[in-house]
Amino acid sequence: MFNSSDSSRLIRLQVNGEARQCAAHMALPQLLESLGMNPRLVAVEYNGEILHRQFWQETEVQEGDRLEIVTIVGGGVFR
């Protein structure tokens, strides 16, 4: 059950090997935005598994989660 006082609680997680804190019950896209990332331009490994974009909105980060976030960069050959 959702408790409004619980929403102000901070949880600890690891993002790209660094300890971070965020609000409890934060959905993954909101976490990405709070980190200054464009959710449309990243890929996410969530606790050791690639998390498909279709599941991001329903995924709330939890205490102790481990995320690896990779920015997608277009490019080509530089000459």
Model-derived features with residue positions:
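Ubiquitin-like/PB1-type beta-grasp interaction modules and other compact soluble beta-rich domains
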Residues: 1-79
